Amino acid sequence: MPPHDCLAEPITRVVNFYETLSRESLGRLGEVYAASARFKDPFNEVVGTGPITRIFEAMFEQLDAPRFHVLEAVGDARRACLVWVFDFRNPRLDGGRPQQIRGASWLEFDDQGRVSLHRDYWDAAEELYEKLPMVGALMRWLKRRIAH
């Protein structure tokens, strides 16, 4: 990833926020996101910093050692695309072994440089469902059937 000083300030702020995200830092979400920000990922679609904060609170409750690593960031003061990996452990998934989800986020910024739209793109079937004991076998079977 380019050095943070080469990126537009809103991008640098959001990258720093995600790479240092913790239960304790969730209180800073309003510094990075607009009050009426829209957030969408494969499981959630919400508006506002309160609901966005609750998504991350649930993440910290359900997962062990969740951490984002931004691999690439491109954009300007109005929009950005981040390519990232998300590392975590879940005692109910694959015996609690480390897991990784690869994805990308599309961000749009308001006039104050805060995130007004955050859209995550990642393959829930490949990155998550295929790792679940019963569902995983079915997903892999379906994938093979569709591929031929």
PLM region descriptions:
Residues V14, Y18, Y33, F56, ...:
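Hydrophobic alpha-helical core bundles mediating ligand binding, dimerization, or RNAP-core interactions
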Residues E61-R67, L71-H148:
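A beta-strand edge to alpha-helix "cap/lid" segment located at domain peripheries
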Residues L26-A80:
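A solvent-exposed, acidic/Ser-Thr-rich amphipathic alpha-helical stretch
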Residues E9, R13, P51, Q99:
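Soluble or luminal CAZymes and related metallo-dependent hydrolases
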Residues M1-G27, E31, R145-H148:
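Short, low-complexity N-terminal intrinsically disordered segments enriched in polar/charged residues
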Residues R13-N16, E31, R54, A58-E61, ...:
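Charged/polar, solvent-exposed surface patches and flexible loops
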Residues N16, T20, R38-F39, P91:
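General structural signal for alpha-helix termini and helix-helix connectors
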